[in-house]
C-alpha cells in the first residue's frame, strides 16, 4: 500500500443500528476499490469485518474493524480508513474508540426499518463529537421500503440539517437508479454501482424541486455575496455549489442523505465520490493535548513536518497473532524500526515493523503520515489511551472517553485450579475492551465481572472458552448488607476459667446503642469509676469490639452505627489478662446486639435514568415496583428526561435488560452507591435464611 499525505486521508466511521447493513456497506466499498473480487456476506461468515469466531457464530459485529481503501478521487488518489463498528449497544466501547479517531461518519439506515435506537445513538454521538456525517440508506431494493417517508422522519427527528442529495428512480416498483439533486441529473444503474445518465422522471419533479431549493438556500447562506446573488435570482455554478456544500457538510450544518442496495451493490460508487468530495481530511482539525514539559495546553494541526506524536486508540490481543496497538498519527511521521517515547508510561518502546490492518490481515508499510491510522505489534507496556512521542517533545493526548459499565455478574472458574488462567485471560480481554472491568469482592468472597450489558458478558464467557480454553460460569451476585441495632441495652459479659493454676478472668458491663452514624462501624467510650476495670485493659475491650463488628451475629455482615460504652466490671489480680477482657467483650456484644432489636441494612444507590419523554411513565412505574423512590425529573440538552431516584442496589440486578425493553433501546442509566438503609422485613428474612443456608452448605 502506498504512503499517503495528510490531505489525502479520509478517516470514516460506519455507525448505525445492529443489522442496518454497515458491514455490507464496507464489503461493497471494498469490492469497488479492488480490495476484494467478490462481496462477502454476513450469513456466510466471509466478510472482512466479521472475522472473529464469535462474530461468525453470532452473525453480528462485536469489535471495530479497520478497512483501509485506496480510491482514485477527483483530485488524485485518496486513502479511506473505514472503521466498521458494532451496532448493538453492549459493544459501545468499540464505537467510542472508533469515533475518537474518525474525522467523519456514515450513519447507515435500513430504509424499511427506518429510524432505530442505534440510529438515534449514532446521531447523538456525532453531535457530541461534532463529527461531519452523511446518512446512507440501505435496502432500497425492498419493494415495500419508502425513501420519501424515511426522509420525512429524518427531517422530523433531526431537523433542517437533513438534505437529500439523491431521490430514487423506480420502474415497475424496482429500484433502478437515482436523481442527483446536486447536479440535477438522472442516473440509471448498469452494472453494480456503475451508472449511465438518464431522464428525470416526471413523478420525481415535485420532491426534486423541494430538495433542490433547500440545497440552493444552504449554498446561499455560505457568504453575503452568495446571499445577495440568491435574492437577485442569479444561478450558482456547479463548482460553487459543490464547494459550498462541502463547507456545510464539514461544519455539520448539512447532513446529506444518499441511498443504495447492499444486495445488488448499487449506489456505492457515488458514496465513494461523496467521501472524496464532501468529507474532510485530518488537516481540517486540531490535535489537542498537554505539553508535559511545560504543563500547558498543546494544540496543533495534523501535520507531518513536526515532531512525532500519536495516540493509541485501540488494542487487539489475539492468542495466535499476538498484540497489536492501533494508533492515529497526530503530528510528524511514524516509521518502522525506530524508538518512540511512551509519554504516559515515561519509557521508550521499540517499534519494529509498521502495519496497516485490513480485517484480520496485516499489510506492512514503511511509514505513516500525520492523520493516518496504523498498527504496531508487540509493544511491551503500551496500552489503549497512551501517547507515543519523542522524549524531547513529550505531548500527551486525552484518552478516549468510554462508557462506564454498570451491569455485573459474579463469575468463577468451572474447574478448580484455573483461577489464575481465568484472571490472565480476562486481563488480556480488558486490554482490548475498556468497558470490561473485574472487581474482587472480598467481603462476599466473589469475583465480579462488569460490562455494558448481558450480551457483552455472554460474549466474554464464550471467548474465554474458545480463545483461552477456560470455562467460566456467571451467577447472580451477592449484595453487601450491613447490620446495626435499634435500641439501647445494658449487658454483662464474663469470661471465667479458674480450675487451678493460672486461670482466665474478665468481667465487663457494657451499654450498646445506635451511634447515629451508619458510615462508621463503632464508637467506643468508657465510663469506669473507681478502677473496677484497670485502664490497661481498655484497649483489650476495644480489640474485642473491633473483632465483633467485622462479622455481626445476625447474618455475618459487618456491623455499623454502634456505640459501645464500658460502664463497669471486675478483675482478678492474677487471672485477668488482655485476652480474658477481649473474650468478655465478645460475649457481651453477642448477647447485647441480639437484644437491641438488630436489623439488616441494604445498600442504596443514587440512580439517574435518561429516557425519551414518552417513556417516563413506564420507567417511573417500574422504579416504584423495584422499591425505588423517585426524587425528581428534569430535561437534558438532548430533549430527554433525566429521572433521579434512590433505589436498593439489589433491585438493579437485571435493570439494564428491562430498561432497554421498556424504552426500545433508547434508555440509559448510571448509578453510584449512596448509603445504607434498613431493609424491609421480608428482605431481611430472605437474606438471613440465604446466608444460613450458604453457611450450612460450606
Regions found by a protein language model. Name each.
Residues 1-698:
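Structural and coupling elements of P-loop NTPases
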Amino acid at each position: 500500500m502506498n504512503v499517503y499525505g495528510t490531505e489525502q486521508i479520509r478517516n470514516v466511521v460506519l455507525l448505525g443500528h445492529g443489522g442496518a447493513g454497515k458491514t455490507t456497506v464496507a464489503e461493497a466499498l471494498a469490492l469497488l476499490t479492488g480490495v476484494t473480487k467478490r462481496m462477502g456476506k454476513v450469513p456466510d461468515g466471509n466478510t472482512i469485518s466479521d472475522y472473529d469466531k464469535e462474530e461468525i457464530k453470532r452473525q453480528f459485529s462485536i469489535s471495530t474493524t479497520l478497512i483501509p481503501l485506496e480510491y482514485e478521487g477527483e483530485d488524485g488518489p485518496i486513502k479511506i480508513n473505514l472503521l466498521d463498528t458494532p451496532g448493538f449497544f453492549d459493544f459501545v466501547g468499540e464505537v467510542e474508540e472508533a469515533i475518537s479517531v474518525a474525522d467523519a461518519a456514515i450513519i447507515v439506515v435500513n430504509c424499511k426499518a427506518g429510524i432505530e435506537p442505534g440510529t438515534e445513538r449514532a446521531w447523538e454521538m456525532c453531535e457530541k463529537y461534532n463529527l461531519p456525517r452523511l446518512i446512507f440508506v440501505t435496502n432500497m431494493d425492498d419493494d415495500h421500503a419508502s425513501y420519501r417517508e424515511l426522509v420525512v422522519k429524518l427531517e422530523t427527528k433531526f431537523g433542517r440539517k437533513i438534505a437529500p442529495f439523491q431521490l430514487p428512480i423506480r420502474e415497475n416498483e424496482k429500484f433502478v437508479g437515482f436523481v442527483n439533486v446536486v447536479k440535477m441529473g438522472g442516473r440509471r444503474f448498469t452494472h453494480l454501482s456503475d451508472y449511465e445518465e438518464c431522464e428525470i422522471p416526471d413523478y420525481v419533479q415535485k420532491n426534486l424541486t423541494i430538495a433542490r431549493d433547500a440545497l440552493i438556500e444552504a449554498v446561499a447562506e455560505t457568504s453575503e455575496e452568495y446571499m445577495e446573488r440568491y435574492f437577485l435570482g442569479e444561478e450558482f455554478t456547479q463548482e460553487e455549489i459543490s464547494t459550498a456544500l462541502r463547507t456545510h457538510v464539514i461544519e455539520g450544518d448539512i447532513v446529506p442523505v444518499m441511498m443504495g442496495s447492499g444486495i445488488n451493490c448499487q449506489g456505492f460508487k457515488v458514496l465513494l465520490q461523496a467521501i472524496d468530495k464532501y468529507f474532510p481530511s485530518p488537516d481540517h482539525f486540531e490535535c489537542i493535548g498537554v505539553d508535559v514539559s511545560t504543563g500547558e495546553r498543546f494544540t496543533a494541526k495534523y501535520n507531518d513536518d513536526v515532531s512525532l506524536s500519536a495516540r493509541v486508540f485501540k488494542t487487539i490481543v489475539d492468542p495466535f497473532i499476538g498484540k497489536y496497538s492501533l494508533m492515529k498519527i497526530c503530528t510528524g511521521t511514524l516509521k518502522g524500526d525506530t524508538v518512540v517515547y511512551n509519554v504516559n508510561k515515561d519509557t521508550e518502546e521499540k517499534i519494529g515493523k509498521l502495519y496497516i490492518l485490513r480485517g484480520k490481515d496485516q499489510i506492512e508499510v514503511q511509514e505513516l503520515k500525520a492523520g493516518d491510522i496504523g498498527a504496531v505489534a508487540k509493544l511491551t507496556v503500551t496500552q489503549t489511551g497512551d501517547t507515543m512521542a519523542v522524549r524531547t517533545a513529550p505531548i500527551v493526548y486525552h484518552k478516549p472517553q468510554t462508557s462506564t459499565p454498570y451491569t455485573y455478574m459474579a463469575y468463577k472458574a468451572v474447574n478448580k485450579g484455573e483461577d489464575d488462567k481465568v484472571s490472565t485471560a480476562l486481563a488480556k480481554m480488558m486490554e482490548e475492551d475498556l468497558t470490561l472491568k473485574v472487581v474482587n469482592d472480598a467481603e462476599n468472597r466473589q469475583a465480579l465481572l462488569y460490562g455494558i450489558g448481558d450480551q457483552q458478558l455472554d460474549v466474554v464467557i464464550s471467548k474465554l472458552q474458545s480463545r483461552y480454553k477456560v470455562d467460566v460460569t456467571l451467577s447472580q451476585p451477592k449484595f453487601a448488607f450491613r447490620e446495626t441495632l435499634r435500641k439501647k441495652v445494658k449487658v454483662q459479659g464474663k469470661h471465667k476459667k479458674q480450675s487451678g493454676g493460672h486461670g482466665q478472668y474478665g468481667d465487663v458491663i457494657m451499654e450498646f446503642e445506635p451511634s447515629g452514624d451508619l458510615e462508621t462501624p463503632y464508637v467506643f467510650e468508657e465510663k469506669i469509676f473507681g478502677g473496677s476495670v484497670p485502664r490497661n485493659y481498655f484497649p483489650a475491650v476495644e480489640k474485642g469490639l473491633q473483632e465483633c463488628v467485622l462479622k455481626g451475629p445476625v447474618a455475618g455482615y459487618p456491623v455499623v452505627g454502634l456505640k459501645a460504652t464500658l460502664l463497669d466490671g471486675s478483675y482478678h489480680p492474677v487471672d485477668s489478662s488482655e485476652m480474658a477482657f477481649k473474650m468478655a467483650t465478645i460475649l457481651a456484644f453477642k448477647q447485647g446486639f441480639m437484644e437491641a432489636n438488630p436489623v439488616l441494612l441494604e445498600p442504596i444507590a443514587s440512580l439517574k435514568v435518561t429516557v425519551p419523554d414518552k417513556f417516563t411513565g413506564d420507567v417511573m412505574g417500574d422504579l416504584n415496583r423495584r422499591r425505588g423512590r423517585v426524587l425528581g425529573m428534569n430535561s437534558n440538552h438532548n430533549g430527554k428526561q433525566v429521572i433521579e431516584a434512590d433505589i436498593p442496589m439489589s433491585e438493579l440486578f437485571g435493570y439494564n435488560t428491562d430498561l432497554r425493553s421498556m424504552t426500545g433501546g433508547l434508555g440509559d442509566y448510571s448509578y453510584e452507591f449512596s448509603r445504607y438503609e434498613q431493609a424491609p422485613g421480608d428482605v431481611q428474612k430472605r437474606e438471613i435464611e440465604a446466608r444460613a443456608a450458604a453457611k450450612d452448605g460450606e
